[in-house]
Curated annotation (Swiss-Prot):
Subcellular location: Cytoplasm
CDD domains: Anticodon_Ia_Cys, CysRS_core
GO biological process, one term: cysteinyl-tRNA aminoacylation
Binding site for ATP: K269
Subunit structure: Monomer.
Motif ('HIGH' region): 30-40
Full protein name: Cysteine--tRNA ligase
Family per similarity comment: Belongs to the class-I aminoacyl-tRNA synthetase family.
Lineage: Bacteria, Pseudomonadati, Pseudomonadota, Betaproteobacteria, Nitrosomonadales
Transmembrane regions listed in the UniProt entry: none
Molecular functions (GO terms): ATP binding; cysteine-tRNA ligase activity; zinc ion binding
Length: 465
């Protein structure tokens, strides 16, 4: 039985989909004005892991992850760069897709862009105006009137007074209440705009997700996810919009992943500890980054540091070494086992962990227990199950030898794969000629470069430290 921690009720709840056998899920994606950072990577990997597990349980998953391609930050960056905002967003959408692919993230069922659904947003704003939940300000902006929605604050667990006192809200003399948020922004020079009943303008950020989720998933769906930073105001405002239009709850389970910190400090450009995914991937294999993310529970803070990434790399290397050592033969890979979820003790433990609010740290612990058993017994069946269960988390699917030969850190001065293979052949020839001094010299040169040779009756293999 799958249980999910629901942010709205602040409790673990048994997961019961609205439609048997089907899960409809929406996750807030990127605002594309820059490269993905580690916080984005966590959202991508966390909800990819959720989708994978739901599919493993046999559900058909309709997964929508939007792209915000019109926003104040996008417009500001495009003006700074002296380029069309559409060119800017196209570039960073491509970069985001490349980063997601590198991290092993499965493409969502749908990836709508906000600019393609402006008509739906206008229709939703009209419905809110008709229900007197919104108003047109004197400057042409349209605002949501939070005092007209009695449930405002229920996701964040705060009253209107608490929110006014404790949250930073934009001061705008056109608002009736400081917490009122914009649904439609009147056009300004040099900004993209669309025709509307209130004049030319563009949608506010919050209405975008309400409109796109309804377009693909209807007025009620199973799971809405995103980063913890979106809980207020973004998701709070989505509730006000969608429930305001339809008069009922539109999401059954709210999921939020925790923050990413760097060396126990908040990640920010001002502190000089802001890292993009691309920067991290110049130093670590993509699978190491994915493994680092899934080793932590999705709701816990994730602390990025070189020490933690190096530890993740070493741990993943141990698992791949087990797969390499217990392949049926030197030249073949471990076959992926068919998982017996009912009768295999390791599979049952793995399922129990994942059904407990997607407890990936406990699931990873099962992988290491399997690895230990494979080493203890030498039985390749354990390695096969290790690979199969790892695949559920999007891990351990590379050929082991290929993974182990990947450079630990990408830097100048390292031997290429071709150079390493040539030196191994030179060493082999030296040994045939009984020139053991030359063979030892070649081994030492490779060892100094972080290349470990492993001799066996089947030949010599190598890996990087």
């Amino acid at each position: 039985m799958l249980k999910i921690y629901d942010t709205l009720t602040r409790s673990r709840r048994e997961f019961i989909p609205l439609t048997p056998g089907e899960v409809r899920m929406y996750v807030c994606g990127m605002t594309v004005y820059d490269y993905c950072h580690l916080g984005h990577a966590r959202v991508l990997v966390v909800f990819d892991s959720v989708v994978r597990w739901l599919q493993t349980l046999g559900y058909k998953v309709i997964y929508v992850r939007n792209i915000t391609d019109v926003d104040d930050k996008i417009i500001r960056r495009a003006l700074e760069n002296h380029e069309p905002f559409s060119a800017l967003t196209a570039r960073y959408i491509q970069a985001m897709e490349e980063d997601a692919m590198a991290l092993g993230v499965i493409s969502p069922s749908f990836e709508p862009r906000a600019t393609e659904y402006v008509d739906s947003m206008i229709a939703m704003i009209e419905s809110l105006l008709n229900r007197e939940l919104a108003y047109v300000a004197s400057n042409g902006d349209v605002f949501y009137d939070v005092r007209r929605f009695p449930g405002y604050g229920k996701l964040s667990g705060k009253s209107l007074d608490d929110l006014r006192a404790g949250e930073r809200v934009e001061i705008d003399t056109n608002k009736r209440d400081p917490l009122d948020f914009v649904l439609w922004k009147a056009a300004k020079p040099d900004e993209p705009s669309w025709d509307s009943p209130w004049g030319k303008g563009r949608p506010g950020w919050h209405i975008e997700c309400s409109a796109m989720s309804e377009h693909y998933l209807g007025d009620q769906f199973d799971i809405h996810g995103g980063g913890q930073d979106l809980q207020f105001p973004h998701h709070e405002n989505e509730i006000a919009q969608s429930e305001g239009v339809h008069g009922h709850s539109h999401v059954n389970y709210w999921m939020h992943n925790g923050f990413v910190r760097v060396d126990n400090e908040k990640m920010s450009k001002s502190l000089g500890n802001f890292f993009t995914v691309r920067e991290v991937l110049t130093r670590y294999q993509p699978e190491v980054v994915r493994f680092f993310i899934v080793r932590a529970h999705y709701r816990s803070p994730l602390n990025y540091s070189d020490a933690h990434l190096n530890d993740a790399r070493s741990a993943l290397e141990r698992l791949y070494t087990v797969l390499k050592n217990h392949a049926p033969s030197q030249d073949s890979e471990v076959a992926t086992a068919v998982i017996d979820w009912e009768n295999n003790v390791y599979a049952r433990r793995f399922m129990s962990a994942m059904n407990d609010d997607f407890n990936t740290p406990e699931a990873v612990a099962v992988l290491f227990d399997l690895a230990s058993e494979a080493n203890r017994t030498g039985d390749s069946h354990y390695a096969s199950l290790l690979k199969a269960l790892g695949g559920v988390l999007g891990l351990l699917q590379q050929p082991p030898q290929q993974y182990l030969q990947y450079p630990a850190h990408l830097q100048d001065g390292q031997y290429s794969v071709e150079e390493i293979e040539n030196m191994i052949q030179q060493r082999l020839q030296a040994r045939k000629e009984r020139n053991f001094a030359q063979a030892d010299t070649l081994r030492q040169q490779l060892a100094e470069a972080g290349i470990i040779l492993e001799d066996s009756p089947q030949g010599t293999t190598w890996r990087r430290e």
